[in-house]
Amino acid sequence: MRLIEKITFCIVSLLMFGSVGKVEAQSVAVRNNLLYDATLTPNLGVDLKVDSLWTLGAVVGFNAWDVDKQKNEKWRHLLVEPNVRRWLNDGVFKKSYLEGDLIYSHFNVGNTTIPFSLYDAVKEKRLQGDLFALGGKYGYSWILARHWRVEVEAGIAVGYAWFKEYECPTCGMKLGEGDRIFLLPQLGINVVYIIN
């Protein structure tokens, strides 16, 4: 089993078996980040209430296709992001929260522009590798209806990426390997459904 498969299995197992006990009203939320969808990356998050002010969760995003096949423009990746939230007001899934994240991603990008000048060389080359990061966010949740919420969140992550670099976006020989420490802004507009 590859590393990413092991990590994903562990996270899903923790979420499933961690909730085997008594499930209370409004103890599970499912969410989707609309900004992540805008990058053509389907994503899904699940949060479980573990205390009156704490939730544990995970987000998975997966982009397995090319942006433009003729140019071989791609931003393929798998992202797994376990998180913990501390709700600051009237209980979970209400008003403001602080969130801590662990982030893992396997990526294969080429002939594209990555925001914030993280990898300027990607326009002329292809990078394939992995990254780990730690992040922190502040967010706010608005109640739309009994089961529906909208969240807005912003934060920052610091991480480390290691990758193989290839000659051109579509093909080419391996040029070498590299690594990089990075700082990345985190933004989200989440549509949330609370399961009773």
Annotate the PLM regions.
Residues 84, 181-196:
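Outer-membrane beta-barrel "beta-signal"
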Residues 51-53, 89-93, 143-147, 184, ...:
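Outer-membrane beta-barrel channels and translocator barrels
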Residues 34-38, 60-66, 86, 102-108, ...:
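Transmembrane beta-strands of outer-membrane beta-barrel pores
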Residues 19-25:
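Sec/Tat signal peptide C-region and signal peptidase I cleavage site
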Residues 26, 38-40, 74-80, 94, ...:
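Residues that define the transmembrane beta-barrel architecture of outer-membrane proteins
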Residues 64-77, 106-130, 162-180:
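Flexible, solvent-exposed loop segments that connect beta-strands
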Residues 30-32, 46, 58-60, 82, ...:
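Membrane-embedded beta-strand positions of outer-membrane beta-barrel proteins
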Residues 30-45, 63, 69-75, 92:
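Solvent-exposed loop/turn segments connecting transmembrane beta-strands
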